[in-house]
């Protein structure tokens, strides 16, 4: 049976082993944007919601306007454009609804108040039919564009996605010639962690078409996006097969791999997997220059932290006998019953369980092993949930 590569396990861990890390968005607040010539401004007021949680709860239940306080029937954000008169007073030109359900993320107003442009939606950058919305000087919508109106489907797939958003652009600006320039993130085929590079998408404000995209630079960017998107699709298919397949220990003896294995083994094996999570600690090779830190983490996990009724999982890059010796030495300082109520999982052969139980006996912890050589099948309910996404 082929071992599952750890980089796939890490992908599974991110998506399934624990709750996903949600984006952190502050509640939408009123914002004011001023034209380049400082004579026009727009105030954008979000639609009131009781809380982000109420908004998303109502969305799931199909209630609209989602998250609205009792008695509020507004369904859209509003914009008010004002002009600075010679006397120094701001005079209202128009006020009306925008296309955004709660609020846009950013906005621009042109000199003379001729155009208002909004970008994205609160808590969902890159999604929706109005990632860009262009309005004329009277508040009439000229055009709303989805991200797919600006870049290809492969380009979108190749961009970085968070739980709520697509990281697709930099800071846009307007030109005196009546154009909107949006720096579009160019996917990198080599290193997603390096600083982002951008390529300008240009839109004509008067009627909203994208007038860029045919240059050699854009053609190269789209070719790169196609390559990255194909890689992601291949990776997702491999991750899917890894999630479905029985789990074995990592084929490469690295710290990152073992963390992934411990997490996935816990969620496949523990009867309490729905209600608990596990900490993971990996003892490094004693010859590694950074070994000492990992022994400190091992000591902290066993003695220093309050793990009452907690769950801990351990693995070792070092030989198993060395790991056992270090654990015995650390637990020599443990008080009787110090880990009572805790569950300890160790990546080790099944035959090592009696030895490990003896070592932990005075602590009161319950000890289990994840045998890397024994395949752990996927839970049917996790598998059903996973496959239901397709």
Each language-model region and where it sits:
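Acidic, small-residue rich beta-repeat scaffolds with periodic aromatic anchors
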Residues: 21-33, 158-243, 373
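N-terminal signal peptide c-region/cleavage motif recognized by signal peptidases
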Residues: 17-19
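Short, solvent-exposed loop/turn segments at conserved positions within beta-propeller repeat blades
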Residues: 69-77, 124-129, 192-197
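N-terminal, charge-rich interaction modules
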Residues: 230-299
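Aromatic (tryptophan-biased) beta-strands that constitute blades/sheets of beta-rich domains
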Residues: 54, 62, 66-100, 133-163, ...
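Short beta-strand elements that form the blades of beta-propeller/WD-repeat-like
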Residues: 37-73, 113-125, 178-187
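Blade-loop segments of beta-propeller domains
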Residues: 88-113, 118-120
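Mature extracytoplasmic domains of secretory-pathway proteins
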Residues: 111, 142-152, 284-343
């Amino acid at each position: 049976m082929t071992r599952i590569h750890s980089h796939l396990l890490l992908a599974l861990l991110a998506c399934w082993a624990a709750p996903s890390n949600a984006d952190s968005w502050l509640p939408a607040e009123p914002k004011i944007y001023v034209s380049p010539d400082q004579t026009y401004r727009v105030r954008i007021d979000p639609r009131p919601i009781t809380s982000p949680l109420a908004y998303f709860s109502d969305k799931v239940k199909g209630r609209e306007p989602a998250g609205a306080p009792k008695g509020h029937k507004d369904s859209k954000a509003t914009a008010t454009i004002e002009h600075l008169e010679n006397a120094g007073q701001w005079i209202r030109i128009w006020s009306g609804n925008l296309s955004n359900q709660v609020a846009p993320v950013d906005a621009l107003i042109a000199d003379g108040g001729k155009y208002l442009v909004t970008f994205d939606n609160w808590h969902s950058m890159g999604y929706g039919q109005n990632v860009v919305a262009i309005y004329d000087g009277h508040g009439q919508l000229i055009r709303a564009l989805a991200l797919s109106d600006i870049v290809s489907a492969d380009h979108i797939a190749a961009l970085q996605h968070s739980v709520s958003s697509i990281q697709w652009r930099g800071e846009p600006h307007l030109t005196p010639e009546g154009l909107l320039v949006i720096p579009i993130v160019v996917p990198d085929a080599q290193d997603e962690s390096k600083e982002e590079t951008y390529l300008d998408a240009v839109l004509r404000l008067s009627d909203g078409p994208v007038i860029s995209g045919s240059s050699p630079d854009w053609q190269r960017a789209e070719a790169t996006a196609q390559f990255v998107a194909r890689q992601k699709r291949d990776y997702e298919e491999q991750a899917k097969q890894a999630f479905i397949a029985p789990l074995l220990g990592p084929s490469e003896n690295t710290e990152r791999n073992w963390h992934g294995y411990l997490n996935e083994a816990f969620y496949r094996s523990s009867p309490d997997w729905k209600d608990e999570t596990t900490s993971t600690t990996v003892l490094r090779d004693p010859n590694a220059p950074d070994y000492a830190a990992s022994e400190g983490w091992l000591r902290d996990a066993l003695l220093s932290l309050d793990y009452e009724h907690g769950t801990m999982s351990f693995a070792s890059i070092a030989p198993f006998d060395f790991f056992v010796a270090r654990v015995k030495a650390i637990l020599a300082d443990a008080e009787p019953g110090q880990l009572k109520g805790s569950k300890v999982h160790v990546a080790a052969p099944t035959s090592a369980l009696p030895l490990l139980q003896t070592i932990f006996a005075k602590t009161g912890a319950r000890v289990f092993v994840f045998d890397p050589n024994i395949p752990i099948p996927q839970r049917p309910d996790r598998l059903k949930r996973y496959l239901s996404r397709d």
